Amino acid sequence: MKLKTNIRHLHGSIRVPGDKSISHRSIIFGSLAEGETKVYDILRGEDVLSTMQVFRDLGVEIEDKDGVITIQGVGMAGLKAPQNALNMGNSGTSIRLISGVLAGADFEVEMFGDDSLSKRPMDRVTLPLKKMGVSISGQTERDLPPLRLKGTKNLRPIHYELPIASAQVKSALMFAALQAKGESVIIEKECTRNHTEDMLKQFGGHLSVDGKKITVQGPQKLTGQKVVVPGDISSAAFWLVAGLINPNSHLVLQNVGINETRTGIIDVIRAMGGKLEVTEIDPVAKSSTLTVESSDLKGTEIGGALIPRLIDELPIIALLATQAQGVTVIKDAEELKVKETDRIQVVADALNSMGADITPTADGMIIKGKSALHGARVNTFGDHRIGMMTAIAALLVADGEVELDRAEAINTSYPSFFDDLESLIHG
């Protein structure tokens, strides 16, 4: 796919699609609750559609009509054995969280995904689930998909310290703990996105959170709710960066989720001197309007507890750093290696091929700016965030063309991405 290049300004206002993390969880909680759940403004990206289809395969009635998802919950013990293996597509969130959901189901399932998902390690979730009494295994010692799982009605509670900062593993164990008899304690390495905790309470569940320690008493019952999904800050991040690095630009992003566990990119933009305004804050929906404009940027250091709050935004932050004066260091981000691709290497290769100066490290990157970008051919390797990062980078290219291979990967999380880009180019 040939990308738009040499765009000298971006103007306009858009509503980014619904938050992917919350969309996944709304389907899961709605399915496990008793009664009806209605979900508004859900993301209809391929990953979320995979989760929706999996729960249909598990016997849940889910209707998508007039822009509203209606789920007839079956309760914690109401899932049915599927007739076929469960297809998770490209979604690491789906396979990991649903492994926890099925921990208490007394039937056997196989879960598989596409080529990219089949390379992602699942041992981080299979190991603690085995401690709870679940029979679960994959391929090689890292438990790569496909996974075979047989849950148990006699699920044991767990006391577990996460060796990595992972909201997916934490959430999988929380879903399992809801079905175990007794108290489970999950201790995070660093605080990660807390959508599962927030939504558990919204659906009538109980837990206690004390810093990095989460305590869940099981078993519990959940009750169907109305869920309004805010815009995804991970999708908004591409427009935030586009507005900052393109000359003569001014962008307004409406209804963006600003959950405090996800707003690391706002902290980074401010540390780099970016002009960013947060207004119209809705404390209930945890959403706001974000306004950015072209800015002179300086390098910064990104690491530690900040990393889990912006792990998915690091590819586009790397592009931002190429347009900042000085050096930006990203560290403590080894988790990038086991995303849809090895994002440390793939981001560096993609942007370096366009003229950036990025040195990959064991746990991040060293980025020297400011770099003039030129045309190149870039492969997403099936990674949606690499595709969108490259499309934003291409806007700066004055010399040559930018070809993007496997651009369809963007549909994973942002099917309307190129439509929104066109609206901002012509705004």
Swiss-Prot record:
Coiled coil: none annotated. The keyword Transferase applies. Its EC number is 2.5.1.19. The active site is at D312 (proton acceptor). It catalyses: 3-phosphoshikimate + phosphoenolpyruvate = 5-O-(1-carboxyvinyl)-3-phosphoshikimate + phosphate. Pathway: Metabolic intermediate biosynthesis; chorismate biosynthesis; chorismate from D-erythrose 4-phosphate and phosphoenolpyruvate: step 6/7. It comes from the Bacteria. Pfam families: EPSP_synthase. One of its GO terms (cellular component) is cytoplasm. It is an enzyme of class 2 (transferase). Phosphoenolpyruvate binds at K20, G92, R120, Q168, R343, R385. One of its GO terms (biological process) is amino acid biosynthetic process. 3-phosphoshikimate binds at K20, S21, R25, S166, Q168, D312, K339. One of its GO terms (molecular function) is 3-phosphoshikimate 1-carboxyvinyltransferase activity. It is found in: Cytoplasm. Keywords: Amino-acid biosynthesis, Aromatic amino acid biosynthesis, Cytoplasm, Transferase. Monomer. Catalyzes the transfer of the enolpyruvyl moiety of phosphoenolpyruvate (PEP) to the 5-hydroxyl of shikimate-3-phosphate (S3P) to produce enolpyruvyl shikimate-3-phosphate and inorganic phosphate. Belongs to the EPSP synthase family. This is 3-phosphoshikimate 1-carboxyvinyltransferase. The gene is aroA.
